[in-house]
């Protein structure tokens, strides 16, 4: 089964790292948002004997009984895959065959990866540029030269759209005073929205203490993300 997974990883553009996979240990896979992780998991679910669990958002049950389940102990005799493994407390102590995650979403230490993919097909070039400015290794894999899905503005003068995501307590309170229902970045981990507005009272993303929360907040949108800081100057 490992060889089948490696073949599929290679076709999706995943790259083998220098960390050697030892037989009997979990195969560890890390991928950025939009790299095709969910597509991979759903294709693996079609294989006999494979069970997929997740520490993130799981699927609703279906008639076939084959779906991405809420994280639980591995099934005896099955080939067990754990998605978003850092969110599941027992990932180290249980016998998983594959551990997979977008590890950039987590502050906690994660396992060393055997395969990685830093190429996103979902996020646009400007979103990628914003993430790279704060130190994330992510690459735009699309073909569209302009990113109409990402806009920057000023926190105190701009209109909020879609799901508001706050990066600090003060920004959260500002959104509430406007009669909105903001979510903290942590609350949105594993979720997606058509449109988001990410807000912070800091003058730049570099000032946000929890850098992994910046990554989470800027990768929740399917179509459009508005980023509002306390100091906005259009990029040259």
Swiss-Prot record:
GO terms for molecular function: ATP binding; RNA binding. The keyword Isomerase does not apply. Homodimer and homooligomer. Interacts with capsid protein. Interacts with host AGO1; this interaction targets the host protein for degradation, thereby suppressing the antiviral RNA silencing. TGBp1, TGBp2 and TGBp3 seem to act together for cell-to-cell propagation. TGBp1 is the main movement protein that physically cross the plasmodesma with the viral genome. TGBp2 and TGBp3 would facilitate TGBp1 function. GO terms for biological process: symbiont-mediated suppression of host innate immune response; transport of virus in host, cell to cell. It is found in: Host cytoplasm. Its main location: host cell. Keywords: Host cytoplasm, Host-virus interaction, Inhibition of host innate immune response by virus, RNA-binding, Suppressor of RNA silencing, Transport, Viral immunoevasion, Viral movement protein. Residues 1-117 form the (+)RNA virus helicase ATP-binding domain. Residues 118-236 form the (+)RNA virus helicase C-terminal domain. This is Movement and silencing protein TGBp1. The lineage of its organism: Viruses, Riboviria, Orthornavirae, Kitrinoviricota, Alsuviricetes. Transports viral genome to neighboring plant cells directly through plasmosdesmata, without any budding. The movement protein allows efficient cell to cell propagation, by bypassing the host cell wall barrier. Increases plasmodesma size exclusion limit. Acts as a suppressor of RNA-mediated gene silencing, also known as post-transcriptional gene silencing (PTGS), a mechanism of plant viral defense that limits the accumulation of viral RNAs. GO terms for cellular component: host cell cytoplasm. It comes from the Viruses. It comes from Foxtail mosaic virus. The keyword Transcription regulation does not apply. Belongs to the Tymovirales TGBp1 protein family.
